[in-house]
Amino acid sequence: MKHLAAYLLLGLGGNTSPSAADVKAVLTSVGIDADEDRLNKLISELEGKDIQQLIAEGSEKLASVPSGGAGGASGGAAAAGGAAEEAKEEEKEEEKEESDEDMGFGLFD
């Protein structure tokens, strides 16, 4: 993903056909090491293709993928209820710890 992001950044910046060296330079400028195999595969697959056209095709493909609907909503509500109960239990435990922390000694006594 990082290789593709650097490639697209170069393309949007005006470089119509970024090379592996260009992508590697972008990645190293932010402290990321480039994976040679993945980078070479990406460059070979995208060579000669228009970035704007690729983005448009990808958007069409994403729009055609079903999103799942309301099936996951009921599971999320149950998980949220469990998280609230855990938070209450943690608060009670934290209160105990706070009372034990002082142990009768003040910081500035």
UniProtKB/Swiss-Prot annotation:
GO terms of biological process kind: cytoplasmic translational elongation
Gene Ontology terms: cellular component: cytosolic large ribosomal subunit
Modified residues (Phosphoserine): S99
Biased composition (Gly residues): 68-79
Alphabetical list of Gene3D superfamilies matching this protein: 1.10.10.1410
Domain of life: Eukaryota
A molecular function (GO) term: structural constituent of ribosome
Disulfide bonds: none
One Pfam family per UniProt: Ribosomal_60s
Biased composition (Acidic residues): 91-103
Record keywords, A-Z: Allergen, Phosphoprotein, Ribonucleoprotein, Ribosomal protein
Region of interest called Disordered, as start-end residue ranges on this chain: 63-109
Entry-linked CDD domains: Ribosomal_P2 (cd05833)
Oligomer status and interactors: P1 and P2 exist as dimers at the large ribosomal subunit.
Family note: Belongs to the eukaryotic ribosomal protein P1/P2 family.
Functional summary from the UniProt entry: Plays an important role in the elongation step of protein synthesis.
Protein name, UniProt field: Large ribosomal subunit protein P2
Protein's organism: Fusarium culmorum
